[in-house]
Amino acid sequence: MEAYTDFASVYDIFMDDTPYQEWADFLSELIEEYGISKRIGDTCNSSTDDIDEVLKSERDLVLDLGCGTGTLTELLYQKGYDMIGVDNSQEMLNIAISKRESSGSGILYLCQDMRELELYSTIGTVVSVCDSVNYLLEDHEVEETFRLVNNYLYPGGLFIFDFNTVYKYQQVIGDTTIAENREECSFIWENYYHHKERINEYDLTIFAKEGGSDLFRRFTETHFQRGYTLKEMLGFVKRAGMEVVLVLDADTHKAPVDESERIYVIAQECRKKQG
């Protein structure tokens, strides 16, 4: 069954303790320190050259790759960035679009598979967090996605992504069952870790309240994610034509250790920049 279909309707309920604001703050700090994208209003408008203005607008674009329901995308927009959100689930994007309508933000949303990313211009920054990259189950899928990211990055542009480690799947969540009850819905999340393939299977069973009634609808979804090592990820980045700027433990913001569960990689486009 395709992931993030029925689950999209209750996704934000079960993710309500996710520190999106902390992520947005940290990503903004990284963009300011290492990137080239500027916030709307921070860009000097003294140039009268149309070409310069077009290039400047491309440089300042920020893409949220695997944006889901757009919570992080909205927060980055509120910080002043010109945002694009890409996700392969139309159901998730429908919720993101409803948030855009409520907030009045100018975010562009595109329904695309990140493995077939297609944009209308180059962009200054790509961010992909909340383990979106782990949904790529084969090495060649990661490499191709990273090559596409690099292809659309403005010279010197920044790619910031996170990923769940093999350690997290093997030692923390693999073969565990999690259950939660909420007023509107309940869920059972069963994990099955396949050691040889390093793939974690999520079987989700969700009971969601139907409208204003006391009736609940049951639906299920199965998700698959693959664990990667830091060495593998750095290899994918380099083969895609980018250089690694920084790697950090996503929880401590310090150098990763063997027990790191989620890792940030900050990479930069270098070939177009050098050329």
Go through each PLM region and give its residues.
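C-terminal lobe and adjacent flexible extensions of AdoMet/dcAdoMet transferase-like proteins
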Residues: 224-275
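Class I SAM-dependent methyltransferase SAM/SAH-binding core
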Residues: 63, 70-116
